[in-house]
Amino acid sequence: HAFVCGVPGAGKTNTMLHICYSLWKNCNVPFLVLEPAKKEYRALSQTDIDDLIIFSPSSGSRFPMAINPFEFAMGLSLSEHIQNLMNVFEGAFPLTPPLPALLDRAIEGVYNDHGWDADDINEGNKEYPTISELYDRLEFELKNTDYDGEVRGNMKSALEMRIGGLLRRDLGNVFDVKISSLKPEELIQHPIIIEMESMGTGPSNF
């Protein structure tokens, strides 16, 4: 690990550009740049890294990106991926009890709808759910809880803000898809830049 710091203009970005370039061209080590602001790492496209992949999810982008969070690596168990998904959701959005339990149940439910069992190992022969299916499943699970009207209404509002936000406009084009632009394992096999400036804090964390 390395921590690169310095005052503005000290050369932090140029240092990182040099490191990324050298890793791929000299050592054949792929890199994944998550750029939360600006588009400075596009400078690498002006070098001789011919296989550089750039994603810039935004309206009218020339470099669109699609990520289905329910698609996971071959050889991984569904149970393990559901736990990873829960960690991602809880890290990206504030979820107070009982929302995590409801979300966990809904995630497993949408996989069940596509023929998955929790102990299944991904062999690439089953379809993955989508975010819109999760949203519909959450509404179903919420209607079947024993919470009173006010609590249920608060939970519905929270889910609308968190999960519903991933369905609207540009974010829907990124996350509410059946197939990702790259398979999960491919994200660590190529030199890749993902520009996240237009996505907002919560979705970027997600």
Where are the regions a protein language model picked out?
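P-loop NTPase motor domains
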Residues: 18-206
